[in-house]
């Protein structure tokens, strides 16, 4: 499972002209689910994201996690993160979990994240989403947990 996390000043997801999720200061998390991923894999990655210290502390160093920074999380599914890109000129999405299975796992991970953290917003699984954000830094990291 892979996550691309970005520290943002604000972010929102719009589907068909309607805002489906919006945060101010916090983390925009794009989540890619692979064929072999499980709920346990996802929980491990979510736990890492919640504890990952990429917010400035009182000394101006990256010492605080999203909770300590009083931020929010905008969680967006993105199967393209699982693409194989080493060969050729077209991404291969074979490593991504099939949509029906991925949707169920994504929904479980949303619920898990909400059980661990109060301010969680989401996109819409498999929708054509418009993601608006203002990067803070920019500060962007790729996180991965093997199944």
From Swiss-Prot:
A family per Pfam: Tyr_Deacylase
Uppermost EC category: hydrolase
MF (Gene Ontology): D-tyrosyl-tRNA(Tyr) deacylase activity; Gly-tRNA(Ala) deacylase activity; Ser(Gly)-tRNA(Ala) hydrolase activity; tRNA binding
EC numbers on record: 3.1.1.96
Sequence motif Gly-cisPro motif, important for rejection of L-amino acids, residues: 137-138
UniProt key word RNA-binding: yes
UniProt entry keywords in alphabetical sequence: Cytoplasm, Hydrolase, RNA-binding, tRNA-binding
Main location, first listed in the record: cytoplasm
InterPro entries: Daa-tRNA_deacyls_DTD, DTD-like_sf
One example of a Gene Ontology biological process annotation: D-amino acid catabolic process
Subcellular location: Cytoplasm
Quaternary structure annotation from Swiss-Prot or TrEMBL: Homodimer.
PANTHER family reported in the protein's UniProt record: D-AMINOACYL-TRNA DEACYLASE 1, D-TYROSYL-TRNA TYR DEACYLASE
Role of this protein: An aminoacyl-tRNA editing enzyme that deacylates mischarged D-aminoacyl-tRNAs. Also deacylates mischarged glycyl-tRNA(Ala), protecting cells against glycine mischarging by AlaRS. Acts via tRNA-based rather than protein-based catalysis; rejects L-amino acids rather than detecting D-amino acids in the active site. By recycling D-aminoacyl-tRNA to D-amino acids and free tRNA molecules, this enzyme counteracts the toxicity associated with the formation of D-aminoacyl-tRNA entities in vivo and helps enforce protein L-homochirality.
Family listed: Belongs to the DTD family.
The protein's name: D-aminoacyl-tRNA deacylase
Protein encoded by which gene: dtd
């Amino acid at each position: 499972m892979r996550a691309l996390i970005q520290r943002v000043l604000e972010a929102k997801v719009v589907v068909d002209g309607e805002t489906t999720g919006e945060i101010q200061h916090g983390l925009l998390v794009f989540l890619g689910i692979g064929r072999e991923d499980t709920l346990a894999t996802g929980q491990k990655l979510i736990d890492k994201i919640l504890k990952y210290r990429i917010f400035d502390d009182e000394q101006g160093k990256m010492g605080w996690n999203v909770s300590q920074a009083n931020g929010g999380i905008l969680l967006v599914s993105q199967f393209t993160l699982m693409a194989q890109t080493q060969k050729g000129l077209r991404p291969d999405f074979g490593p991504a979990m099939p949509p029906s299975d991925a949707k169920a796992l994504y929904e479980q991970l949303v619920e898990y994240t909400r059980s661990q953290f109060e301010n969680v917003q989401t996109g819409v699984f498999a929708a054509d989403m418009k993601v608006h954000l203002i990067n803070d830094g920019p500060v962007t990291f790729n996180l991965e947990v093997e199944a």
